Swiss-Prot record:
Source taxonomy: Bacteria, Bacillati, Mycoplasmatota, Mollicutes, Mycoplasmataceae
GO cellular component annotations of the record: cytoplasm
InterPro entries named among the record's database cross-references: Alpha/beta_knot_MTases (IPR029028), RlmH-like (IPR003742), tRNA_m1G_MTases_N (IPR029026)
Protein name: Ribosomal RNA large subunit methyltransferase H
Catalytic activity: pseudouridine(1915) in 23S rRNA + S-adenosyl-L-methionine = N(3)-methylpseudouridine(1915) in 23S rRNA + S-adenosyl-L-homocysteine + H(+)
Protein localization: Cytoplasm
Length: 155
């Protein structure tokens, strides 16, 4: 299975990098995981910034037409680990099992971007820093594969 995570910016604190790398290494035995980091536009009027970042995402997503896309958005439906297990299990049954998660820019997506996708979920009802969101997501993906493979999470 291939999983890609598109996000804005880089992990810039050692503790985030360490946590992320730990889960990344653990996941290698289950999945081909790739992180795609985009440069976020941060200067200008809010709606213009949202449009520019959303357009950048749309252009990047054109390269992944055969992936199931899941947009992470704090205002969308809350997803549970069990929901994520079902999504990944369902995709594992396809020959071309490919999922792409999108962690949006810090100011959010444009309305038109959000309206063009049906798979939108929130990892929490609290606002997470984007770097922490990336770690929570990769940890949940790791947890899902432990569940799918009937393996203990804590050793």
């Amino acid at each position: 299975m291939k999983i890609k995570i598109i996000c804005f910016g880089k992990l810039d604190k050692a503790f985030y990098v360490d946590a992320f790398n730990d889960y990344f290494k653990r996941l290698k035995k289950y999945v081909d995981l790739e992180i795609i980091e985009l440069k976020e536009e941060i200067n200008g009027e809010l709606n213009k910034i949202k449009d520019e970042n959303s357009n950048l995402l749309l252009k990047k997503l054109e390269n992944y037409k055969d992936f199931e896309k899941i947009i992470l958005d704090v205002n969308s439906k809350l997803i549970s680990t069990e929901n994520l297990v079902e999504i990944i299990k369902t995709n594992l049954n396809y020959k071309t099992a490919k999922i792409l998660f999108v962690i949006g820019p810090s100011d959010g997506y444009s309305k038109s971007f959000l309206n063009s996708f049906t798979n939108k979920f929130s990892l929490a009802k609290i606002t997470l820093p984007h770097q922490l969101c990336r770690i929570v997501l990769i940890e949940q993906i790791y947890r899902v594969f432990k569940i799918i493979n009937n393996e203990k999470y804590h050793k």
